[in-house]
Regions:
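Residue patterns forming the tRNA-binding/recognition surfaces of aminoacyl-tRNA synthetases
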Residues: 1-25, 44-46, 51, 104, ...
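Protease-associated
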Residues: 38-43, 65-135, 141, 145
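Alpha-helical recognition segments enriched in aromatics with Gly/Pro capping
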Residues: 150-162, 268-270, 292-444
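Short cysteine-rich clusters marking metal-coordination/redox-active sites
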Residues: 208, 279, 322-325, 710, ...
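Residues immediately within or flanking Cys/His clusters that coordinate Zn2+
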Residues: 205, 276, 319, 707-710, ...
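Acidic, turn-prone loop/beta-hairpin segments
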Residues: 330, 476-504, 536-635, 639-657, ...
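Cys/His-coordinated zinc-binding microdomains
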Residues: 267, 283, 326, 714-717, ...
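Short functional micro-motifs and their immediate structural scaffolds
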Residues: 216, 287, 329-331, 715-721, ...
């Protein structure tokens, strides 16, 4: 103080600020931030301000005088003066220092005959107040933690009902509920001249998350696990676990690295008891291998209810005496284990005790909500590291929470949740499973009637696709009709190439637990690759080609492979639909690779991609064909809209494009792919053009189709006397 030019003979006050005046009697320290600047200032006051009564006989009354000296954080000085209603003109700044310089200076408690040291705390902020924080280790977590670092007593003179005990040593407070204490403490501070100001403000306050009632913090004696003893080993073990998503590793690492000792005791009437005894003669805490083993044997026979049923003497080994004083009067611990400790040892209780069935730890996966990094994932990890020295799991998957379509989090207490059995009753279990697979579970997600209805439509499309496949395989026997890969058309090979891609991407999605990608790939394959492309094109081959022709059997071969793969891919998410499809598959198509008939699709192997189908050259080839198909479709559409043509089979298309090598090589198949009666690759504009359409470097001319409409295939061609084309005549013969 001398260095700052401050007269140490004057009264010096550290100003604190609190929203819980009732905790002032429990104040044990004042916290300041080590790196904040603190200002010492003197307030010059007159008699009128010193006392409200003109005839007051106080020593300082009636004279102009230097006032007391106060210390407040520099960053809050202006706000502080405004709060207490002091004029800056009456303030004389005497000096400044860092909070670090104030460490371990003692202050005198205004209401209790004890000293409160100034300590350093990183939790101190400049958001509000004075920068000097009232610290009561018995009534706040941060206060408790900073107090422990300085060895400050944890003083909490309240009982379990929130009523002051005689430990408060204040007759005005003993037996009074804490919530009535604010008025009493404020009056006491006023009476002793220690209250500078008070005001009403709105601020957040802790409430019970379940019943929504306000709560208070009260420190009580507890049992702890000293995490420091195995923290480094735990952090190392975290790196060996696969975290899904990967961000989970950093999250739990930060929690373990920064966590304090783990409090494992709870004050409840039910739960697993803590097997500790106390000597009633000398107070010795008794917890030994011998006593724990004896209690464990009793619990194994009679369950943990025996702790309530029997006395301490009956639970201890026969003839047991206190190892400290030799007496034999004992009482039991009344606290129970933290339920997180209970769930945290499930790896031992469930897995290790049934190792003949489940194997040994580490287990393959723990799966729970993202809040369990602080809960089950961490408690399981800590118990396993403390006792086994290894993580109890190989991988951990976390998911977000479910919200309604209105964006509100679903909660049992709010009653705004959808019952799964209602969805199952209305739509079936597969729809609920499909919803779970469709969402990116790594984030919070939504569910509601509209979302379920949309998924039901997707489900129907998948089902309709399967019906189409089944309907066109009724006469296909793979043992007799299967067409070799080399005899398939380029279109057929491309369909199998896309099927191979589906197998690879879906398998990878499952391997990485990215089920939403499975949903996206399956939906895209069924809607785009099949319904809108391959199946749309091959209908003509299936319906008009000869029943046993190579063209039809080749197409059926592809449909057979698609169905065999699709039904297996459906199994993990939509097992009921998969089994329903399988029941409709002809018996000759139900054999596995060994030729054995599969009674249920659930017994089949997962599909594997075929190396011979991986013809990547088809990707580039058909990307150009698909582009041309899209352009041709857009060229025909205005004619259909104007009702100049009804079906695309009524037209012929002439396509001009700079890079036409691929289209020219497949020119004979283009009319089938475009679903027109004729298709030509040419740079010459035909006559009688119905529509000319340009897009990028494409030019498409649309004309009336050549010939007459075949009564069987509906294509426009040269017809015979029976009114059908030559291709249909050959098919009939």
């Amino acid at each position: 103080f001398a260095a700052a030019g401050i007269d140490s003979s004057k009264d010096l006050y550290a100003v604190i600020w609190t929203t819980t005046p009732w905790t002032i009697p429990s104040n044990m320290a004042i916290s300041v931030h080590p790196r904040f600047d603190y200002t010492f200032f003197e307030r010059r006051v007159g008699a009128a301000e010193l006392c409200g009564e003109e005839d007051c006989s106080a020593v300082k009354c009636g004279q102009e005088s230097d006032g007391d000296i106060y210390v407040v954080a520099q960053g809050l000085l202006g706000a502080f003066l405004a709060d207490v209603g002091w004029d800056e003109k009456d303030i004389k700044v005497l000096g400044e220092c860092k909070g670090q310089a104030l460490e371990l200076l003692n202050t005198k408690h205004p209401l209790v005959d004890r000293k409160s040291p100034i300590i350093l705390g990183e939790h101190v902020t400049l958001d509000a107040g004075t920068g000097s924080v009232h610290t009561a280790p018995g009534h706040g977590l941060e206060d408790y933690e900073v107090g422990c670092r300085y060895g400050i007593e944890v003083f909490s003179p309240l009982d379990s009902r929130g009523v002051w005990t005689d430990a408060v040593k204040d007759k005005d407070l003993e037996g009074v509920p804490y919530y009535k204490g604010n008025a009493i403490v404020i009056e006491k501070l006023q009476n002793c001249g220690a209250l500078l100001a008070q005001q009403d403000i709105n601020h957040s306050y802790p409430h019970c998350w379940r019943c929504k009632n306000p709560v208070i913090y009260r420190a009580t004696p507890q049992w702890f696990v000293k995490v420091d003893k195995f923290r480094d080993e735990t952090l190392a073990a975290i790196k060996d676990v696969k975290w899904i998503p990967a961000s989970g590793e950093a999250r739990i690492s930060n929690m373990v690295e920064g966590r304090t000792d783990w409090c494992i005791s709870r004050q409840r009437a039910w739960g697993v008891p803590i097997p500790v005894f106390y000597c009633e003669d000398c107070g010795e805490v008794i917890v030994t291998d011998e006593t724990i083993e004896n209690v464990a044997k009793i619990f194994e026979k009679e369950s943990s209810d025996a702790w309530v049923k029997y006395s301490a003497q009956e639970l201890l080994p026969a003839g047991f005496k206190c190892p400290k004083c030799g007496k034999n009067h004992f009482k039991k611990e009344n606290d129970i284990m933290d339920v997180w400790f209970d769930s945290g040892i499930s790896w031992r209780a469930v897995v290790e005790k049934r190792s003949d069935v489940l194997g040994h730890t580490p287990v393959e996966m723990y799966l729970e909500g993202s809040d369990q990094h602080r809960g089950w994932f961490q408690s399981s990890l800590l118990t396993a590291m403390a006792t086994e020295g290894k993580a109890p799991y190989k991988s951990v998957l976390t998911h977000g929470f479910v919200f309604g379509e209105d964006g509100r989090k679903m909660s049992k207490s709010l009653g705004n949740y959808i019952r799964p059995d209602e969805i199952i009753k209305t739509y079936g279990a597969d729809i609920l499973r499909l919803w779970a697979a469709s969402v990116d579970y790594r984030n919070d997600t939504k569910i509601g009637n509209n979302i379920i209805k949309q998924l039901a439509e997707i489900f129907k499309k998948t089902r309709n696709t399967s019906r189409f496949l089944l309907g066109n395989l009724f006469d296909f026997n793979p043992a007799e009709d299967y067409v070799r890969y080399e005899d398939l058309t380029e279109l057929d090979k491309f369909a199998l190439y896309k099927l191979n891609q589906l197998i690879d991407t879906v398998t990878e999605a499952f391997d990485n637990y990215e089920f939403y990608k499975y949903f996206q790939q399956l939906q895209n394959f069924a809607a785009v690759d099949l319904s809108s492309f391959y199946l749309d094109i091959v209908k003509d081959r299936l319906y008009t080609a000869g029943k046993k022709s190579l063209s039809r059997r080749a197409c059926q071969t592809v449909l057979y492979e698609i169905l065999q793969t699709l039904v297996r891919i459906l199994v993990p998410v939509m097992p009921h639909q998969a089994e329903d499809i399988w029941m409709s598959v002809p018996e000759c198509q139900k054999c596995d690779k060994s030729g054995n008939s599969l009674e249920s699709i659930l017994l089949s192997d997962w599909p594997k991609a075929r190396p011979e189908w991986n013809n990547s050259a088809l990707e580039d080839e058909f990307s150009k064909i698909l582009k041309a198909r899209e352009v041709v479709t857009r060229a025909i559409e205005p004619l259909r809209a104007d009702k100049k043509v009804g079906s695309s089979l009524e037209v012929a298309v002439y396509v001009s494009v700079n890079d036409n090598a691929v289209l020219k090589a497949n020119e004979k198949e283009l009319s089938n792919i475009f679903i027109t009666s004729q298709a030509y690759i040419t740079d010459e504009k035909p006559s009688d053009v119905l529509n000319e359409y340009k897009e990028d470097d494409y030019t498409v001319w649309v004309t009336k189709a050549e010939g007459e409409k075949c009564a069987r295939c509906w294509k426009y061609r040269k017809l015979n006397s029976d009114g059908i084309c030559q291709e249909c005549l050959d098919a009939i013969k």
